[in-house]
UniProtKB/Swiss-Prot annotation:
Low complexity composition bias: residue spans: 19-54, 63-76
Keywords: Plasmid
Highest rank taxon of the organism: Archaea
Disordered as annotated region, ranges: 1-77
Organism this protein belongs to: Methanothermobacter marburgensis (strain ATCC BAA-927 / DSM 2133 / JCM 14651 / NBRC 100331 / OCM 82 / Marburg) (Methanobacterium thermoautotrophicum)
Official protein name in the record: Uncharacterized protein MTBMA_p00030
Amino acid sequence: MSLLGGMWKSTKPSRSKSPKPSSNPLRSSGLNSGMSSRLNSKSSLRSGHSRSSNTGRSSRQKSISGSLGSNPISSSRLNSKTLLSSIFMCKYLYPPWINNFGNFGRVEPPPLIEKNLKKSKKIKIKIHPWTGFPYNQVLSEKAKKYKKIRG
């Protein structure tokens, strides 16, 4: 314990002497800054960055975070562009009866198909909910009897 205390006392006055302004601060700061710049230049040469390695790293991080989509405005613009392009691709690649976006400048299907569609719309086949067969008078009478028995 006494040895440690003695060492502490011997190192303490040397520390208090060094930060005095009269001990040529230009020279000491020049040496320190020279050493730090040498260290920075060595590390920057190894990693392939510019001389001021700290600013290079921060700008690189900013560019990476920007490309990842941290800005919601740019990412939404990208999404809307891709959505619009997919709509236009659907419009011009597929025929208009597959496409839900309308037929701009496309030839409509032939009129025979339209007539057949109109006929099929007019004819409605009613299917009975219990039997699963189409309605007839006989089936409907049987269904009425069945309904009376069950109900």
